[in-house]
């Protein structure tokens, strides 16, 4: 116990300690962050302004966009600030907050994707009961349950992680405070901690994943029984974006928690983290805007209206 020291801050090693490369990473992260910010903001605005999209599916999509924006905002701004100021420091409590909110947004995101699968199941397999089962109160309660489950899951993960002692080692081989890397700095054997973290993650993931799979099996069986090709295409078009988003989230989430911590190549850790911490919130708006006809129309109308307003204003000023 005499060799233990209190850790008051962590060093986020990130990608490189070379100033020129840090500026390059700052520019790349800024572009990715702005793409995610603009994409999710357009989704939210387009749905809010289009009365035809005021239904449960798009209500959940607004929640997803908010969670996506929070998810990427937990890690990217701090990393960009460190790169710009040529520093690697983050305070102990700053690291605690980053871990808490990162797990919160990730867990709530997955819970919401599960709810969205249920919404598509009711819409396609039980259309006559859709308005009764997916009324406004039910939708608000389901969305709230996703956010609350994120808080509970995050509290468990964060509490388990920071209950351990750090023996003076404070260098985190990542561009943000990541649980597997923090457990690697533990004084005592962190094997039990890693098992608890991975077990909790896998339990939540398996429950949600099983629910999503069962929902889509029923959806596909129902869609294949639709006699008209146009009807089948319309049903698939509302499900395909969600299915792609779920696959992307699960694929990248598997990288996050199942990659080895002790034997992983340090140079690859930040690059792999980009895959699961930046790509989903950046790609989700693109997937929904490209694969959903109603969303594409709403976005085109929104962007066209803004361009028209700008042109009209410029003509008026001249």
Language model features: what each stretch is:
Residues 1-318:
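Transmembrane helical core of 7TM receptor-like proteins
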């Amino acid at each position: 116990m005499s060799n233990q020291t209190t850790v008051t801050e962590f060093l986020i090693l990130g990608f490189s300690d070379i100033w020129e490369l840090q500026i390059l990473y700052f520019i790349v992260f800024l572009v990715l962050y702005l793409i995610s910010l603009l994409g999710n903001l357009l989704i939210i605005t387009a749905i809010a302004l289009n009365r035809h999209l005021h239904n449960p599916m798009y209500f959940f999509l607004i929640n997803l966009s908010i969670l996506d924006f929070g998810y990427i905002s937990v890690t990217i701004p701090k990393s960009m600030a460190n790169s710009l100021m040529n520093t690697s420091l983050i305070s102990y409590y700053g690291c605690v907050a980053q871990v808490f909110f990162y797990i919160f947004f990730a867990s709530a995101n997955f819970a919401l994707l599960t709810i969205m699968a249920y919404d598509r199941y009711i819409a396609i397999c039980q259309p006559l009961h859709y308005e009764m089962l997916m009324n406004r109160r039910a939708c608000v309660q389901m969305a709230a349950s996703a956010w609350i489950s994120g808080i509970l899951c995050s509290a468990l993960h964060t509490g388990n992680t920071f209950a351990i002692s750090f023996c003076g080692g404070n260098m985190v081989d990542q561009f943000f405070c990541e649980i597997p890397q923090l457990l690697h700095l533990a004084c005592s054997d962190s094997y039990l901690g890693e098992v608890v973290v991975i077990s909790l993650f896998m339990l939540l993931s398996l429950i949600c994943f099983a629910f999503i799979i069962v929902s889509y099996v029923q959806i596909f069986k129902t869609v294949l029984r639709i006699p008209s090709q146009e009807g089948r295409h319309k049903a698939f078009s509302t499900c395909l974006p969600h299915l792609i988003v779920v696959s992307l989230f699960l694929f990248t989430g598997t990288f996050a928690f199942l990659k080895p911590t002790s034997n992983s190549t340090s140079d690859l850790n930040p690059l792999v983290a980009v895959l699961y911490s930046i790509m989903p919130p950046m790609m989700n708006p693109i997937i929904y805007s490209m694969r959903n006809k109603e969303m594409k129309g709403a976005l085109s109308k929104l962007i066209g209206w803004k361009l028209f307003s700008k042109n009209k204003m410029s003509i008026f000023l001249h």
